[in-house]
From Swiss-Prot:
Transit peptide interval: 1-38
Source superkingdom: Eukaryota
Organism for this UniProt entry: Coffea arabica (Arabian coffee)
CDD domains in alphabetical order: Terpene_cyclase_plant_C1
Protein name: Limonene synthase, chloroplastic
Length: 606
């Protein structure tokens, strides 16, 4: 049965024209918080007045909403009981031996171009490239130079090789034009139909097409052409089973959109089934994955202790108690062993975001939310006195945790970041408050209003300000001054927003949440839900084209590690929301299985 979760149009130019007005709604510039229309504001004000009147009557109970969230799947005692033999020296020693063998492969002289591309591709997909970044860059630089000097000849008849070369170079920051695919296009401007029998070539071109930039029509055409024929391949009988699995996986989500750590676990199994498996790479991939998993488990134990001791979930029983899922976001963003302190900090940040989100979305009255927003904006512990009792535990736990993170940065780098953190957290709460006002007013925002607020309410500026502090040494004022409104942050926010809205919108609307982008566009365009979802997928693809501008990000004040983390947040969002809400609900078995494989289940030895 063919699978295609990503709606693909039949005509690239007509698609762009059809969606142009929606794409123009993607705002740019500093965050602003839109005001309601006069009528909507009057309605919201009346709603707030009603709440205030009710709160003044001590005997009157407030009718609060409920998210009906289940208890956590992984309890504190289970997490603390985790033991992992791969933390021992014997496995680290064996991994070091294997890494030396891989270095010899990378240093081999006169390696054929295709062999080089396949080796680098294997290392990247198996999650091993971080060990060999310097060697990989030198190897690709040498090959790139040789191509331009005419010492490497491209095979103009091998679609698989051409597309693999294009993808590996582009995803490593080298400028390769889409024109290299002109040799596979007929005089009428279409890809040669004879290529439809070359399934490996189609798969390679399909993956390459998702590294497209804005305006690259050839790659848009390649995506449509390959998607059509790969789906046809799945509809055939008696096909190669291993290739069939690879095609199915790619059509489910392209490699460019997959979180590297989660993809590595899947690809280890796929690679083991390959007839061209390299035993050294396979053994190293298995051992390294398990060693890193052992490190991640220690990080998880640490944040689990913090979450239990802060007692927020115990006191605020209406929130999502999801410390493992929060940690999964962190390893999806930065999995490398050396970033343990960043993962721990990000997990705490995600847990606090989840708490605050549930206060605004589910439990708080409009008056209470205005008080909480003011307290965060003032960043004053004395503001706790104005809050209702249930908010005080959450506010103080939040306030102390963020100040402690700022203190760590001051202690370790001598950089005072509390004002930067205060601003992004205050902006987040203001965006949440805007959504609450829309809800109480019964107001459906325009697409432009929604997106201008939603890229902030998705909390990515908060995540990435903390991530910057976690992966950058030394931090610099230039980067922090522009971070919360930089294009890389806005694009990352949109990727999360689109994935979140596509995955959780039905459940949240049932609960009584503010309309999401799908509903906003349905109302504005007068279209069906299916058509609206297709629009959102289009926006997601267009945003990835902006994210693919690696040469531009290289000129930014941010490190490659930070830019990768920004992309990875968008990738993890697709993992978490691909089959529904994998963060808040337990009804998404695929997300649960991915968490189990990444965090709790070692890869079986060869």
């Amino acid at each position: 049965m063919a699978i295609i979760n990503l709606p693909v149009p039949t005509n690239s130019s007509s698609e762009v024209n059809k969606h142009n007005h929606l794409r123009s709604c993607l705002p740019s510039g500093r965050a602003t918080f839109t005001t309601l229309s006069a009528a909507a504001m009057r309605s919201a004000t009346m709603a707030a007045a009603n709440v205030r009147e009710q709160s003044g009557q001590k005997q009157q109970l407030i009718n609060r909403r409920s998210g009906n969230y289940e208890a956590p799947l992984w309890e504190f005692d289970y997490i603390q009981s985790l033991k992992n033999e791969y933390a021992g020296d014997i496995y680290v020693s064996r991994a070091n031996e294997l890494k030396e063998q891989v270095k010899m492969m990378l240093d081999e002289e006169d390696m054929k171009l295709l062999d080089c591309m396949e080796l680098v591709d294997g290392l990247e997909r198996l999650g091993l490239a971080y060990h060999f970044e310097g060697r990989i860059n030198r190897l690709l630089s040498s090959d790139y130079k040789a191509i331009h000097e005419g010492n490497h000849q491209r095979n103009k008849e091998d679609l698989y090789a051409a597309a693999l070369e294009f993808r590996i170079f582009r995803q490593n920051g080298f400028n390769v034009p889409q024109d290299i695919f002109n040799d596979f296009i007929t005089e009428d401007g279409e890809f040669d139909e004879s290529l439809s029998e070359d399934t490996m070539g189609l798969l390679s071109l399909y993956e390459a097409s998702f590294l497209s930039l804005e305006g690259e029509a050839t790659l848009d055409l390649a995506r449509e052409f390959t998607t059509k024929h790969l789906n046809n391949y799945l509809g055939k009988e008696n096909t190669d089973q291993n290739l069939r699995i690879l095609v199915y996986h790619a059509l489910e989500l392209p490699l460019r959109w997959r979180a590297p750590r989660i993809e590595a676990r899947w690809y280890i199994d796929a690679y083991e089934r390959s007839p061209n498996v390299n035993p050294t790479l396979l053994e190293l991939a298995k051992i390294d994955f398990n060693i890193v998993q052992a490190i991640h488990q220690q990080d998880l134990k640490h944040v689990s202790w913090w979450w239990k001791n802060i007692r927020i979930a115990e006191k605020l029983t209406f929130i999502r108690d999801r410390i493992v899922e929060n940690f999964f976001w962190a390893i999806g963003a930065v999995f490398e062993p050396q970033y343990g302190s960043c993962r721990r900090m990000l997990t705490k940040v995600f847990a606090l975001i989840t708490m605050i989100d549930d206060i605004y979305d589910v439990y708080g009255t409009l008056e209470e939310l205005e008080l909480f927003t003011d307290a965060v904006d003032r960043w004053d512990v004395k503001a706790i006195d104005q809050l209702p009792d249930y908010m005080r535990v959450g506010y103080l736990g939040f306030f102390n945790s963020i100040n402690e993170m700022a203190y760590d940065a001051l202690k370790e780098q001598g950089v005072h970041i509390v004002e930067y953190l205060r601003k992004v957290w205050a902006d987040l709460c203001k965006a949440y408050l805007q959504e609450a006002k829309w809800y109480y007013a019964g107001y459906t925002p325009t697409v432009e209003e929604y997106l201008e607020n939603a890229w902030v309410s998705m909390s990515v500026p908060v995540m990435l300000m903390h991530a910057y502090a976690g992966v950058t040494n030394p931090m610099n004022k230039e980067a922090m001054d522009v971070l919360d409104t930089h294009d890389i942050v806005r694009c990352s926010s949109y990727l999360l927003r689109f994935a979140d809205d596509l995955g959780t919108s039905p459940g949240e609307m049932k609960r009584g949440d503010v309309p999401k982008l799908v509903q906003c566009y349905m109302k504005e365009a007068g279209c069906s839900e299916e058509e609206s979802r297709e629009h959102v997928w289009f926006l997601l693809r267009e945003t990835w084209k902006k994210m693919n501008k690696d040469s531009e990000w290289a000129e930014s004040p941010f490190s490659k590690t930070f830019v990768t983390a920004a992309k990875n947040f968008g990738r993890v969002a697709l993992v978490m929301y691909q089959y529904g809400d994998g963060h808040g609900l337990h009804s998404n078995p695929e997300a649960k299985d991915r968490i189990l494989a990444s965090l709790f289940s070692p890869v079986p030895p060869a």
